[in-house]
């Protein structure tokens, strides 16, 4: 006798919406599917709803729903069935609204999004709204002043037309730099509201006890940081940490890319033993350590502090790794129980 199959818990969902050619599809393809930014120039418009599963690590798994740019509300066909938009908004965790910053005037791109915001909030008041002011990479955005002007324009327009009860955050993004990864990092963090405060407290304690300057918990595959300490995130520091991950993986591919049988492996060269220490010419040390399945702790500190506290750092990082498993332990225990229940029903 075989037990009925266990239904998997629905994954949290991130919904992308915005006008045609605003860059919705380019964003998630660059961040989560490793597409080169230049390749996105050849992407066509999204004719139908696209659903992608992101499951790079064992702790944070979610779906991306990419809506066609000409969607103007009402019903939508999903896998051959007509579904009302209220059901869609009710099941979402985050709604990402993408605005083309190169649209002139930018208010024209915002007009169609207001109804979406109001309709979604009416159905799901707990929904998080994230506005990506995208494509800030044109000739008119070579300095910070026009970027800030565009941000101010969007914020003012939204504030005048929607309720103050609606939670809206704004991000200036481009697929040609790390700003899009920083923006998506803050979106992904909304999917773990129960665990995020604990992770941030752990990272705060780590940098305080080890005299570090900054720390990130990275999803290695996407370069999205799942958590960071409460010190401000400087883009140069974030880019440096991302570059370190790239170099560490590239070196692992060259010198450690074989499996147990001695054959070349096509999997990402990153495992439970992965660790790297980079010493920069300016006296800074970058420290990378694997702490979970495709999860890496990356820290930045002064070389003098690292030399004095290397043993303490190793000990505290090991404690962090063990505690990380405990933070997500209820989730892992439930999944293990489901697997045991399924196997116990077989005879």
Question: What function would you assign to each model-found segment?
Answer:
Residues 48-50, 59-119:
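Switch II of P-loop NTPase G domains
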Residues 126-129, 138-214, 233-237, 243, ...:
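Canonical P-loop GTPase G-domain recognition
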Residues 199, 232-286:
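A charged amphipathic helix-loop-strand protein-protein interaction module that recurs
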Residues 1-19, 46, 50-53, 156-159, ...:
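Short, flexible boundary segments at extreme N-termini or domain junctions of P-loop NTPases and their
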Residues 215-221:
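Short hydrophobic alpha-helical segments used for membrane anchoring or interfacial signaling
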Residues 290-298:
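Short hydrophobic/glycine-rich mini-motifs in sensory/regulatory modules
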Residues 32-61:
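Switch I (effector-binding) loop of TRAFAC-class P-loop GTPase G-domains
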Residues 12-35:
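Glycine-rich phosphate-binding P-loop
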């Amino acid at each position: 006798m075989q037990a009925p199959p266990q239904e998997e818990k629905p994954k949290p969902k991130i919904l992308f919406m915005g006008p045609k050619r605003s860059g919705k599809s380019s964003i998630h393809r660059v961040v989560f599917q490793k597409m080169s930014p230049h390749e996105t120039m050849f992407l066509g418009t999204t004719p139908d709803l696209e659903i992608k599963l992101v499951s790079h690590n064992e702790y944070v798994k979610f779906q991306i729903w990419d809506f066609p740019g000409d969607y103007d509300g009402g019903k939508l066909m999903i896998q051959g069935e007509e579904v009302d938009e209220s059901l869609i908004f009710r099941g979402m965790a985050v709604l990402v609204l993408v605005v083309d910053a190169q649209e002139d005037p930018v208010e024209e791109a915002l007009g169609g999004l207001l109804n979406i915001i109001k309709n979604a909030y009416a159905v799901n008041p707990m929904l998080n709204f994230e506005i990506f002011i995208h494509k800030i990479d044109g000739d008119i955005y070579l300095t910070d002043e026009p970027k800030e002007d565009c941000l101010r324009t969007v914020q003012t327009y939204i504030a005048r037309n929607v309720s103050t009860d609606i939670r809206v955050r704004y991000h200036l993004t481009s697929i040609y730099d790390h700003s899009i990864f920083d923006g998506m990092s803050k979106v992904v963090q909304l999917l773990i509201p129960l665990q995020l405060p604990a992770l941030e407290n752990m990272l705060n304690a780590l940098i305080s006890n080890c005299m570090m300057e900054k720390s990130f918990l990275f999803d290695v595959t996407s370069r999205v940081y799942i958590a960071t300490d409460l010190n401000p995130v400087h883009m140069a520091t974030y880019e440096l940490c991302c570059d370190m991950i790239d170099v560490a993986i590239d070196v692992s591919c060259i010198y450690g890319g074989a499996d147990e049988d001695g054959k070349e492996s096509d999997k990402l060269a990153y495992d439970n033993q992965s660790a790297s220490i980079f010493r920069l010419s300016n006296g800074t040390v970058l420290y990378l350590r694997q702490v979970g399945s495709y999860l890496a702790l990356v820290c930045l500190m002064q070389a003098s502090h690292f030399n004095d506290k290397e043993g303490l750092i190793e000990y505290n990082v090991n404690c962090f790794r063990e505690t990380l498993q405990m933070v997500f332990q209820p989730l892992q225990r439930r999944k293990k129980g489901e697997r045991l229940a399924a196997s116990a029903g077989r005879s």
